[in-house]
Amino acid sequence: MEGTSDKTLLLFDFDGTIVDGDIAHTLLGTTLTKEELKYVMDTGEMNYAQSMDRYCKLMSSKGKTMNDLHPILESVKFNDGIEELFNFIRENKSKYYVILITGDDLYITSYYLKYKKWYDIFDYFIGIPAFIDEKNDKQLLTIQFLPPHTCDFCDKSLCKTNEFLKFLDKNKEYKSSQIFYICDGWNDYCLSKNYLKESDFIAARKGFSFWKLMQKEEYNKNIKSQVLYWDKGQEIIDFIKKNSKV
């Protein structure tokens, strides 16, 4: 993938940032009984891949396909102003690289963005690999497990810092890009603390996990970048316009 440093890199989280809530939790909460939900989620630790693997096998045993579940994914709402932000990016795409980095599996996030007709503004997707295996009729989705990590801020399935560094190692042309990280959660703090520089910017959703961490000096002191706390997409547009080098 080609790229040059004359573009700004817009890095997006998904759950709580692009969409209101958690798309996988919406899927599970809509389709499972309390007993089934406990079974799927009781992995002993935060482990998205293991939970989704259990979920897919359970739903397959009921004869369900992804076509049965697509309407639930389609019903998830964007956060206020996110589509306006996406439209701004589309109109100015020559200035920006756009990457999604999520702890979700990439099937449900990609499906959602394709259905909402915003998939094309993204240049790259970082997340848990997942696909429909037509040869395996006993599995709804095939979830691929990434190597284990020891990060305390990320779900055990995926460390955002680890995966972003892997991406940069294969796509070195992105290393010199100024970054705007649009996010909200604990695992976003991980990447912000470990990689983002003084020349980068963070747009963290007001009132959510990242914001709560930043109210404490022990966490705040580790962030080098300037941080905006946002409620609506227009605030992010204004933040990018004011601070982007391009």
Give the location of each predicted region.
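C-terminal cap/substrate-recognition subdomain and adjoining C-terminal extension
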Residues: 9, 80-99, 104-246
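Short boundary motifs at domain starts and secondary-structure transition points
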Residues: 1-3, 171-172
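Alpha-helical substrate-recognition element adjacent to the catalytic core
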Residues: 2-129
